[in-house]
């Protein structure tokens, strides 16, 4: 793979899921990669081991003699000293999505979009193609144990990636197959209205060439609204609404799911997933429909889905003992994702006590969706809400907005046990004392709440295995 005379790439915010995936692909393709992030961790350590030069914090001199600087939509260019230094030095500065668009020019692109389920569905399609011997190149915004990372550079023609709607990033991509998993209100700071968001998805879908295909889930009302505006071939999938590819006979048993797929007038029973939840069945349908379009034999699709082993931070079980006590870590941060994670726990472990530990993500999202979070958390037996993970936002810009809004919303929705605990150590101590019997402790959020799940799992492993 060549990008003109480019030999060295500097990535600002290299520790992020999407940025680290680009870094891994560039490293594997022989490019020199440097990068900076405010904090270090497992992701930056892995990149360093693969040959990247990683800096903690941002400094102008770290740009060095890079040929191009890449940054994510979460970065404010005018406030970043590295980007300013690059511009002053005449070094091209581009967003992540533009780099992705360039990388796609060398491959047959399978792009997975949607408000929810992008990472899991992308990983399912990747696993299916690898098991079918297609050797795809894969870029996922998360870490897959099966893939041993977030990126695989294959020798085949397919490039399978997530297509993120944030900041209209996916409109830079040129998919041959465009998957639309789900669609509802999200990123209103970018779009303003659901109508504008829907228009963006229509534009993304219609970028598919005449020989490509759009694969979309008709269980979402907003997707049903966009279908009449598609001017490309499309395949539908769903569970509740009539569709070209459907699931039935679903059985949930702990962290496993079984179901039958109906497609093209045929039935394929006994499809098995090693992940729980109705939402994962839906993700598998998207992968199944994609496989059929790519000409993969149904039995090989099913074999690939069976090999899918989940993603880190997607209902990741970090601790499980013989007494039925589990620690689960999940990336859920939108109300629909939170609801799906709680439902997966409730359906898979119907006799267990479900303890939900939720960290809201972004002040703007918490303010907009507080009531929806209340309803989403309602099926948990105990609910503990941490303070908000701010990410790119500042608390001073959102006076009066805190995790207490979510706890209050749970009570408003009829929940009896919901508590806001801002102090992180107190939150940990409270959760640690919860299990008295079969219990699923479900940590949810896109921020640093994951560290508490790791700490709790580690402590219980040491405590109960001693």
Swiss-Prot record:
ATP binds at residues 114-120. This is UDP-N-acetylmuramate--L-alanine ligase. Gene3D superfamilies: Mur ligase, C-terminal domain, Mur-like, catalytic domain, NAD(P)-binding Rossmann-like Domain. GO terms for cellular component: cytoplasm. It is found in: Cytoplasm. Pathway: Cell wall biogenesis; peptidoglycan biosynthesis. Pfam families: Mur_ligase, Mur_ligase_C, Mur_ligase_M. It is an enzyme of class 6 (ligase). Its main location: cytoplasm. GO terms for molecular function: ATP binding; UDP-N-acetylmuramate-L-alanine ligase activity. InterPro entries: Mur-like_cat_sf, Mur_ligase_C, Mur_ligase_C_dom_sf, Mur_ligase_cen, Mur_ligase_N, MurCDEF_pg_biosynth, UDP-N-AcMur_Ala_ligase_MurC. Its EC number is 6.3.2.8. Keywords: ATP-binding, Cell cycle, Cell division, Cell shape, Cell wall biogenesis/degradation, Cytoplasm, Ligase, Nucleotide-binding, Peptidoglycan synthesis. Belongs to the MurCDEF family. Disulfide bonds: none annotated. GO terms for biological process: cell division; cell wall organization; peptidoglycan biosynthetic process; regulation of cell shape. It catalyses: UDP-N-acetyl-alpha-D-muramate + L-alanine + ATP = UDP-N-acetyl-alpha-D-muramoyl-L-alanine + ADP + phosphate + H(+). Cell wall formation.
